[in-house]
Amino acid sequence: MASEQAEAVDLVASDTVKQLSGAVLFAALTAVLAQFSIQLPGGVPFSFQPFGVFFAGLLLGPLWGGFSVLLYVLVGLAGAPVFSTGGAGVGYVLGPTGGFLIGFVIAAAVLGFVAHRSLTPESVVELSAVSVTAALLAGLAVIYLVGVPWLAAVQGITLVAAASAMSLFVVGDLIKIGLTVGVVAGGNELLADWR
């Protein structure tokens, strides 16, 4: 009796599995980082969740980075307490911070595209500090462009008043960008395999 060897069949390409795993990982990381937050007056907490958004876009690129943050938002919409201060559900997303959550999804995709100038990401260690900084600033601009008008509409205040309230966050967000650029620049060995 001749022995036949079973041939392995890939149902899903290994690159797709890697990207999906990365998206799930960064969705979880964003959820964990959201729990490190400080509630400020006005209903918008200062949190570390933008780090998850930044790294998802930079490391996974525009498609999978955006998908990762979308997954995070969908898990929160489904009721898991993954948003800042343990928030969850449709009511939370329709509240003052909902625009920022939507902005996070768009920002991850935009900053991933700006950084890589393509839908397919290259290794993040190949990116210059200037392109990483530009990408992060573009992502941050998207977050504010979606979040501030949403905040104004939900709170029933003027756009100027909402922008003024959010000005407290700008310095902290710029520090987050500086730290992210530093990690990318200094983490060559650790980050080299993410592409």
Regions picked out by a protein language model, each given a short descriptive name:
Residues 34-38, 60, 76-80, 84-87, ...:
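Short helix-capping/hinge motifs at transmembrane helix termini and TM-loop junctions
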Residues 22, 26-30, 53, 57, ...:
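Alpha-helical transmembrane segments in multi-pass membrane proteins
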